[in-house]
């Protein structure tokens, strides 16, 4: 099984008023080339897709275009994206039902009730030729306030 792991893209980040869009686009093209060459079974993106929790429309389009290109480069690959501390978990998940049609699983929040965590959302199968060859346990960035019943001492 081959897994490609990446994180901390920070799309939309500027450095002292220097627009980094060109280098971010170059990174996404390079990532797509790697996926094309390596044909991994899964790609895991572990948070901080965006630098700001409310990214500009152009930044969101850059992400969407990149994920579609990556999917086209390796249509059978399972893609897992988790939210990081810079991402808005709810905004990242907003199109998750649509993304699933492209083999992309977005986990922005930990789904829980007062009694339990919904693990089904977090356990993602990696399939190869219609059979399960592994699993990814997708856990987004967790804030202590998400678990008020935990003893913090």
Give the ranges of each region predicted by the language model:
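N-terminal active-site segment of His-dependent metallophosphoesterases
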Residues: 1-68, 75-76
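Proline-centered loop/turn at the N-terminus of a beta-strand
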Residues: 2, 78-80, 105, 135
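Short, charged helix-to-loop "capping" segments that act as catalytic/coupling loops
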Residues: 70-79, 113-115
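His/Asp/Glu-rich metal-coordinating catalytic cores
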Residues: 87-153
């Amino acid at each position: 099984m081959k897994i490609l792991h990446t994180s901390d893209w920070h799309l939309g980040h500027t450095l002292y008023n220097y627009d980094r869009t060109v280098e971010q686009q170059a990174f996404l093209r390079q990532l797509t080339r790697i996926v094309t060459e390596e044909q991994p079974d899964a790609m895991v993106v572990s948070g901080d897709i965006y630098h700001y929790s409310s990214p500009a429309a152009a930044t969101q389009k850059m992400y969407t275009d990149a994920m579609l290109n990556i999917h086209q480069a390796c249509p059978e690959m399972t893609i897992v994206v988790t939210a990081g501390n810079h991402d808005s978990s709810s905004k990242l998940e907003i199109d998750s039902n649509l993304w699933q049609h492209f083999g992309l699983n977005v986990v922005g929040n930990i789904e829980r009730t007062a009694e339990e965590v919904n693990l089904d959302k977090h356990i993602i199968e990696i399939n190869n030729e219609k059979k399960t060859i592994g699993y990814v346990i997708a856990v987004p960035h967790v804030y202590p306030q998400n678990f008020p019943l935990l003893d913090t001492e």
